[in-house]
Regions:
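Membrane-embedded alpha-helical bundles of multi-pass enzymes
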Residues: 1-192
Length: 192
């Protein structure tokens, strides 16, 4: 599921219409469901698989101004570095699943905030999760309150919410709630 989720997230970054970007939420939900029972090195492996499937296709333009080896190394290096965030999910043994998921989202968004504001790395061209919703005005308007980190928090929390519904609610409930989320985003997008 990790590779499929990564490919879907990468694909939504290139979607020509905001409606085609909605699968990002379900792709992340599948990712969160896949990691909920894993521990240790398996979490890192799934995280690395997801990050590589997402970042390698979205850094295609590195090859235009870097040598192939440097471009590939930069993409793989960042993917493997960011996959370390998945170790946080192993903390669920100590702080329960909800605490680990919240800490994961906070850590991801903090890393993004630092990456986009720190003096040396602010100009690094690394794809953001927010690219997967960049055509959706009802979501991107929230970037005024914290930039890319806020967009990533919204995308991650929507994925977590859908994963929770799939795991904990009856089938009819999660289908209705997931469809409701999609309809809510669609309505909000048409208003903005």
């Amino acid at each position: 599921f990790a590779a499929i989720s990564g490919i879907v997230v990468a694909g939504t970054a290139f979607a020509p219409h905001w409606l085609l970007q909605l699968p990002v939420f379900f792709a992340l939900a599948l990712l969160f469901i896949a990691v909920r029972r894993l521990s240790g090195i398996h979490l890192y492996g799934v995280g690395a698989c997801f990050m590589l499937a997402w970042l390698l296709p979205t850094t295609y333009w590195y090859y235009y101004f870097m040598s192939p080896g440097v471009a590939f190394g930069a993409s793989v290096g960042w993917a493997l570095l960011q996959a370390n965030l998945f170790w946080i999910i192993a903390l669920r043994r100590y702080i329960r699943t909800y605490g680990a998921v919240v800490l994961f989202v906070i850590a991801w968004c903090t890393l993004t905030y630092i990456r986009t504001h720190a003096p040396v790395v602010e100009d690094w061209w690394i794809p953001h999760l927010g690219y997967s919703v960049w055509r959706n005005d009802s979501i991107t308007m929230w970037s005024a309150y914290g930039g890319e980190a806020v967009l990533e928090a919204i995308v991650l929390l929507c994925g977590v919410s859908i994963a929770w519904l799939i795991v904990h609610a009856r089938m009819s409930v999660w289908i209705r709630m997931s469809c409701g989320l999609v309809v809510l985003v669609a309505i909000a997008n048409s208003i903005v």
